[in-house]
Amino acid sequence: MTLFDPERGRPIVAPPCDAPGCWAGAPGAYREGSDLYVVYRLRGPRPKRGYEVIIAASRDGARFDTVWSADKDRFGAESIERCAIAHVGDIWRLYVSFVRHNDRRWRIGLIESRAVDAFDPADLVIVLDPLDLGLAAVKDPWFRREGEGWLMFTSYGTLPLTGGTGLHDTGDALSTGRTISASGLATSPDGRRWTWQGAVLLPSASGWDSFTTRLSTAVRDGDGWLGLYDGSASLAENYEERCGLVRSRDLHHWERVNADGPSIGTVRGPGGVRYVDITAVGDVFYEYTRADGAHELRVAHTS
């Protein structure tokens, strides 16, 4: 099954440099009527890493203009990854995943604002902290509503059974090979106070997604849901995950559609797809691997 053809997608943000480790992507999409928003991050090779988060807006889905941005120093961060945006009543919300300089752990914070162009990183409040959850890391949030409440899906890493000494020395516990990198769920009545519910999608016992499974979005599929996730088989593929499909009746329990390999994009090399987000009307944003190894942000539409 193919929801969209990544080769036919249109590049909308180029990477900041033309080499592996140079990325524009990790998008979080939000549509409100005719207004389309995408929040994404820019990244350079180490030691720069994810250095800027940007919100862009479009009225026609073709031209995207920057309405807000902030560099990682304003968050006291070593790196920024996937973020999410939502508009609730008269309040805009920006959820940011970042590594703090002081302890080098991935966590998720929330900033609220009356306007989409007025977020102040000084107002950030931590909503999911790995120290509180007994985890090595938590990052890459995205959302769905469930009744009057909220579901937040994240990437997370478990603490190693052998102990955590040195786990955060690189500022990225998920890139050490010492954690289980899986997809988890938190629930909230209001989008501010969150309760961790645990795993919803774990790596397979063997195969192409046995190292990482990062659920990235979900769309309606009849009476249930079709989910897209990033998978990898080893630490060597950590920054070149591929896109697989899973199904769910309730957003809480997921089953793989194809265990043999990725379902969207190439198996390896250029043309790889990761960090997909899809709006309710079918706007598709994704990070795409170019021939030079850099990643660009593309937009497409579901078939």
Feature map (PLM): residue ranges:
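Carbohydrate-active catalytic/glycan-binding domains of CAZyme proteins
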Residues: 1-303
